[in-house]
Amino acid sequence: MSNGTNIDVAGAINTLAETFGKLFQMQIDVANTALKALADVAEPLGKTATDLIGSFTGAATQVLQSVSSAIAPKK
């Protein structure tokens, strides 16, 4: 009665579940790598921005001190 074709439903479902699990894990790995790359880029940019603001503040302070001493009455 059987023509020799035997369908392994449990095996097919198991393989499908395993494949979906691997795909999901790969998506998590890609998202993880992307977040790590963003963090690696943001860290030096943040430090550079902080250094730039500090330099600008120092320069502005020196300019204000020079202007103040130029305006101040001489004794």
UniProtKB/Swiss-Prot annotation:
Region of interest called 4 X approximate repeats, as start-end residue ranges on this chain: 8-61
GO cellular component: chlorosome envelope
Superkingdom of this protein's organism: Bacteria
Any GO BP: photosynthesis
Compartments, record wording: Chlorosome, Chlorosome envelope
Chief subcellular location: other
Sequence repeats: 8-17, 29-39, 40-50, 51-61
A GO molecular-function annotation: bacteriochlorophyll binding
Keywords annotated in UniProt: Bacteriochlorophyll, Chlorophyll, Chlorosome, Chromophore, Photosynthesis, Repeat
Stated role: Component of the photosynthetic apparatus which may bind the chlorosome to the bacteriochlorophyll a protein monolayer.
Family membership: Belongs to the CsmB/CsmF family.
Name of this chain's protein: Chlorosome envelope protein B
